[in-house]
Amino acid sequence: SRGLGDVYKRQLMSDYDREMFNLELERKLHFLRWARMIRISALKRNGLNHLMKAVDEAHAAAYRKIPTPKLTRALFEAVERQQPPRARGGRPKPRFAHQGGSNPPVIVIHGNALEDIGESYRRYLEGFFREKFDLAGTPLRIEFRTKENPFVKDDNKR
């Protein structure tokens, strides 16, 4: 599955080495914070129920369908909490959101001047949607679509 990883023979490590290994793993895999870390032991035969539950949750999150009105309300809530930063004299204006696919879930946000939204705000929205709709254990893609202004003259379209 996309949201699961494993480490073998952890029980052979000392407590100190195991703790240092966990810290190093979290540091190096910071970009996978959305993935659950399940600790199992084949030797002690524990953790498998947690692992299977995590697999089921990741699968359910990857295929979850989220209605457009709920996504749009969540988008407005996210923007109300934290406005997109100004760029080029204006502020990007997200208008609505819909689900553009599943496995992994894709949330498509439509609006004006969205090409000016930076990576940090994209990560903020990803975290907000992930928490709001319980999308743990699966990657989440955010796409921005800006409608062209029909009143802006483009010399190339003559």
Where are these regions (language model features)?
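Conserved nucleotide-binding/hydrolysis micro-motifs of P-loop NTPases
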Residues: 9-13, 42-48, 98-102, 113-116, ...
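Long, well-ordered amphipathic alpha-helical subdomains in the mid-to-C-terminal portions
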Residues: 52-59, 65-117, 122-125
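Residues at or immediately flanking beta-strands
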Residues: 91-93, 139-143
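Canonical P-loop GTPase G-domain recognition
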Residues: 12-66
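Short, non-transmembrane amphipathic alpha-helical segments
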Residues: 25, 121-135
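Terminal-proximal interaction/regulatory segments of ATP-powered molecular machines
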Residues: 141-149, 158
